[in-house]
Every structure is written in structure tokens, then in C-alpha cells.
């Protein structure tokens, strides 16, 4: 059982590190498809979301 909790803690820490790499850019949007070209221009990756009318890019 201790090994399970250890693996769970490691998984949570790795997830937090990965999620902290998200980048908000100062681009307004209404749908996610509007963010893709802006994220490609800003960080070189197309992974994006439109959240609260702001583009969020994922490297």
C-alpha cells in the first residue's frame, strides 16, 4: 500500500510540473480554432484552448 501512495504522489508532482508549462497569451478568442494560429506564432505549437476569451497554449 505504501508503494501505491508513493507512485500516486510522484504522478501528482509530474502532472503539476507538466500543467505549469501552460502559457496564456494576450489574444482574445471565442472558439479554440481561433487560438491555433496565434499559438503557432507565439510558441510554435498548435496545442491550444480558448478559456474565458483568452488563448491558452500548451507546449
UniProtKB/Swiss-Prot annotation:
Residues 1-22 form the signal peptide. The record marks 49 as: Basic residue of the functional dyad. Expressed by the venom gland. The keyword DNA repair does not apply. The record marks 58 as: Aromatic residue of the functional dyad. GO terms for molecular function: ion channel inhibitor activity; potassium channel regulator activity; toxin activity. Gene3D superfamilies: Knottin, scorpion toxin-like. The keyword Secreted applies. It comes from the Eukaryota. Keywords: Disulfide bond, Ion channel impairing toxin, Neurotoxin, Potassium channel impairing toxin, Secreted, Signal, Toxin, Voltage-gated potassium channel impairing toxin. Pfam families: Toxin_2 (PF00451). Belongs to the short scorpion toxin superfamily. Potassium channel inhibitor family. Alpha-KTx 04 subfamily. Has the structural arrangement of an alpha-helix connected to a beta-sheet by disulfide bonds (CSalpha/beta). This is Putative potassium channel toxin Ts25. It comes from Tityus serrulatus. The lineage of its organism: Eukaryota, Metazoa, Ecdysozoa, Arthropoda, Chelicerata.
Amino acid at each position: 500500500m505504501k508503494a501505491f501512495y508513493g507512485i500516486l504522489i510522484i504522478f501528482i508532482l509530474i502532472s503539476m510540473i507538466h500543467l505549469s508549462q501552460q502559457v496564456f497569451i494576450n489574444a482574445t478568442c471565442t472558439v479554440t480554432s481561433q487560438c491555433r494560429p496565434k499559438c503557432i506564432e507565439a510558441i510554435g505549437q498548435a496545442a491550444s484552448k480558448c478559456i474565458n476569451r483568452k488563448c491558452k497554449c500548451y507546449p
